[in-house]
From Swiss-Prot:
Gene3D superfamilies: Zn(2)-C6 fungal-type DNA-binding domain. Pfam families: Fungal_trans, Zn_clus. GO terms for cellular component: nucleus. CDD domains: fungal_TF_MHR, GAL4. GO terms for molecular function: DNA-binding transcription factor activity, RNA polymerase II-specific; sequence-specific DNA binding; zinc ion binding. InterPro entries: AtrR-like, Transcription_factor_dom_fun, Zn2-C6_fun-type_DNA-bd_sf, Zn2Cys6_DnaBD. It is found in: Nucleus. Induction: Induced during biofilm formation. The gene is FGR27. This is Filamentous growth regulator 27. Residues 209-221 have a biased composition (Polar residues).
Length: 787
């Protein structure tokens, strides 16, 4: 007989609450009537519904979700206790850090508190304000501040200081608490100076009215509480970012160095930017503006040719008239010519704008009307990825750059490059399909070279990522000398190829130094060799001497080839500055903090030569641009100046730091020589400042830099500078109509031998990772991520 089957029932497991009961939050609270009728209860006694209908309002079911009020009261009490404990600790630190009244500070001691201005000497943040460079000191300060309690912080302060949010007053209580901080509490990204006597006298701290905010005084340039940020806000308040390769990044570092040497000056305190709204223009027109009379049209097209097409190839001008201008003027309203009509309007807009600039008319209203007309027509067209789309966005890029909308311009440059890549302009085997049509083949290659040049110049000048990858473009002309080309090339095409090769080297410098966070000595030597080899293998027709003698340049009736040749040599000198900049800044900071030098003793001679190369390149670039301004510029009135003003400003900052730390004596020139170069830079920038807000602001900053250098010796005995070098290469070095062959040879020698051959052997040019990488102290503070 089988055993009876017994049914077993699984015992139900009780669900375990993941959150303890005392930490559960209230979801709802309702009386019995509202729960029964599923009405929304106000939770009061009596509730709204019961009061309205006269029911008895009772709460018989109480769960722990209804006890949130008691729990929150306990949490608030706990938070208040923590605040009192924190204030007590700060008070104890303040009492233990009282300084003897006889100690005086050697250098101003900044305190890094992120607080709000009370009485700013500069403009405050507003919609009509110029955008502000939130420029922070890359130089470490002796005594970083203790972080204020949350109750003392401005709730609207988000950590981005502008002149409108920089403090200028101090409370006696908070200032005392910031006098002495142990090393262990110093921020990670700071250079602790070992001079313990650099302490602030308590009696030197100004008192503050009790009714004002208790905020500590801000000294120097803010480092955003340990973050090294290049942050911009344009006139409308839109946020923009400038990266490590931009001149504003160099200015940011220079302000910190000047603060350490000179203290608070207008250079370190005036953080204004350019009053530009960097956004696309709105379309307000209902119909396009009429095309200008042919005679007026030809003037605008000529201005476009001089300012843009000579250096940044866009059109073959003969075909431009034949295929675009003539057809559009025959029947402007035909559906077959609307794409060409858009291109013509954009060309007229650029030409008209630069014509007004040459006449010192910064408004350029006619150019704005033509540009808006082109965009109005473009709005009704379909961008079909044809060649006209590449040209359309490339022309918009040039127009926005002319009115200083750099971020907006870069957006259109990106679109133009994407369309060009979709057409295969970056692939040699695709372009070779047009080999039977030689003109089309060369046009495609030259247009993509222009896009590449614009990418390398514009992206690097504002510190943005490069758009075109070198591995993705297989044009063989980038890696061969111009005289090795199969097809015969005119002078402008040769210059175009060499300009592309220089831009390739600039891209490699950026990739090797400013994308990585490690300086590689072997890569530095490799890039120095490549810069030297470029100069050594340059076609004699394109040599530096021809810039000084435009009459010897072929096909140069309108001086267009002089401009592109000038651009080649200026960018080569700027590439030397860019290559040398990390070493130059390292040497400048090492003067303040000698302990840093111990991290780089093995390659000290290389670093020294690169620093001198940065100074020499800056001097030569300014002299070369000054010669151009005094000669060719007055003849052609070319107002496109992005390369000139950026390199000029970059060079002036390098010379200012050179004067400040006294390294000019080792290089063989006097302070007076460098000051004259700074004055030349001021003259160059002033030529474009009327119609270019960027040049105007650069000019103001350069004046502040000169003023800070001149006034730094006030109250001190100025020691005369003695030049002990037997060969003073750059004294009385001047380019002019009577310049001798020695001056030209000096320039050519520098381009080929800016670093000694004893330190760099040509066999070191092989690729590969270096076995001697080194990391500068606080590298992230200067060249790392700045957000």
């Amino acid at each position: 007989m089988s055993a009876p089957i017994v049914e077993t029932k699984k015992a139900s497991k009780r669900r375990i609450r993941r959150i303890p009961d005392d930490q559960r939050q209230k979801v709802s609270s309702a009386c019995d009537n509202c729960k029964k009728r599923k009405f929304k209860c106000s939770g009061e006694k009596p509730c709204f519904e019961c009061s309205k209908k006269g029911h008895d309002c009772t709460y018989t079911i109480i769960d722990k979700r209804s006890l949130r009020g008691e729990r929150m009261a306990k949490l608030k009490q706990k938070k208040d206790n923590n605040e009192k404990q924190r204030e007590l600790v700060n008070e104890q630190i303040a009492q233990s850090s009282i300084i003897h009244p006889q100690i005086t500070p050697v250098l101003p001691v900044p305190e890094y508190a992120n607080v709000t201005y009370q009485d700013s000497s500069h403009s405050t943040v507003s919609g009509n304000d110029s955008y502000h460079l939130s420029s922070s000191s890359s130089i470490p300060q002796n005594l970083p501040a203790i972080v204020l309690p949350d109750t003392l912080r401005d709730p609207n302060n988000r950590g981005i200081l502008t002149p409108g949010s920089t403090p200028n007053s101090v409370s006696s209580e908070s200032s005392v608490s910031n006098v002495c901080v142990p090393k262990s509490l110093q921020p990670l990204l700071s250079f602790p100076l070992e001079n313990k006597n650099n302490l602030r006298h308590k009696s030197e701290e100004p008192d503050m009215d009790n009714n004002t905010n208790n905020v500590p005084k801000k000294g120097g340039i803010s480092n955003q509480e340990g973050k090294s940020a290049i942050l911009l806000v344009d006139k409308s308040g839109a946020f923009r970012y400038m990266g490590e390769t931009s001149p504003l990044s160099v200015l940011y570092e220079a302000r910190g160095i000047f603060y350490e040497y000179v203290g608070s000056t207008k250079l370190t305190e005036d953080l204004r930017g350019c009053p530009v709204t960097d956004k696309p223009l709105k379309i307000t027109m209902k119909e396009a503006a009429p095309l200008p009379h042919p005679s007026e049209r030809d003037v605008y097209i000529e201005r476009f040719k001089v300012n843009i097409n000579g250096a940044y190839f866009v059109f073959d001008m003969d075909k431009f008239y034949e295929e675009i201008v003539d057809k559009v003027y025959e029947n402007p309203n035909s559906d077959l010519v609307q794409e060409n009509r858009v291109l013509l309007y954009f060309v007229l807009a650029i030409g008209s704008t630069y014509k007004d600039f040459s006449e010192r008319n910064p408004q350029a209203e006619k150019g704005a009307h033509y540009f808006e007309s082109g965009r109005l027509i473009l709005r009704d067209l379909v961008e079909d990825s044809a060649m006209w789309c590449v040209l359309c966005h490339y022309l918009q890029f040039h127009y926005y750059e002319s009115i200083l909308k750099k971020s907006t311009a870069l957006v259109h440059l990106t679109a133009a490059i994407n369309y060009a890549q979709s057409l295969g302009l970056h692939r040699n085997f695709v372009n070779e399909q047009f080999s039977k049509l030689t003109a089309e083949y060369e046009y495609r290659r030259k247009l993509f070279r222009s896009l590449y040049i614009s990418d390398r110049i514009s992206s690097v000048f504002i510190g943005r990522p490069l758009i075109i990858n070198d591995y993705d473009w297989d044009d063989p002309a980038r890696f061969k000398n111009t005289n090795a080309s199969v097809l015969p090339l005119d002078f402008n095409s040769k210059c175009h190829i060499e300009l592309t090769r220089i831009c390739t080297l600039v891209g490699r410098i950026v990739a090797n130094f400013y994308q990585d966070k490690m300086i590689d000595v072997k890569k530095t030597k490799n890039l120095a060799i490549q810069l030297r080899l470029w100069s050594k293998g340059l076609d004699p027709e394109l040599a530096f001497g021809n810039v000084l003698n435009p009459s010897q340049i072929s096909n140069n009736e309108d001086n267009g080839n002089t401009v592109i040749l000038l651009g080649i040599h200026i960018l080569h000198l700027w590439a030397v500055m860019l290559l040398s900049r990390p070493f130059f800044m390292f040497e400048a900071i090492s003067k303040i903090n000698p302990e840093m030098r111990k991290s780089f003793e093995e390659e000290e001679e290389l670093s020294k030569q690169l620093c001198q190369a940065a100074t020499k390149a800056s001097i030569l670039a300014i002299k070369l641009m000054n010669h151009y301004i005094n000669t060719t510029f007055h003849e052609i009135k070319r107002m496109e100046c992005y390369v000139i003003i950026t390199c000029c400003f970059y060079a002036s900052i390098i010379l200012g730091i050179t004067i400040l730390n006294g390294t000019f004596e080792e290089a063989g020139y006097t302070e007076n020589d460098l000051m004259n170069s700074l004055k030349d830079a001021q003259y160059i920038l002033s030529q474009f400042s009327v119609c270019n807000k960027g040049a105007e602001r650069y000019s103001e900053i350069n004046l502040d830099l000169i003023s800070a250098l001149v006034n730094r010796h006030k109250g001190k005995e100025v020691k005369p500078v003695v030049d002990n070098w037997s060969c003073n290469l750059f004294n009385d070095f001047n380019f002019g109509d009577t310049s001798g062959q020695n001056d030209v040879q000096t320039m050519m020698d520098f381009q080929q031998f800016f670093v000694s051959s004893d330190l760099i052997q040509f066999e070191e040019i092989t690729d590969g990772t270096s076995s001697l990488p080194f990391d500068y102290n606080n590298y992230n503070l200067f060249f790392g991520d700045k957000l």
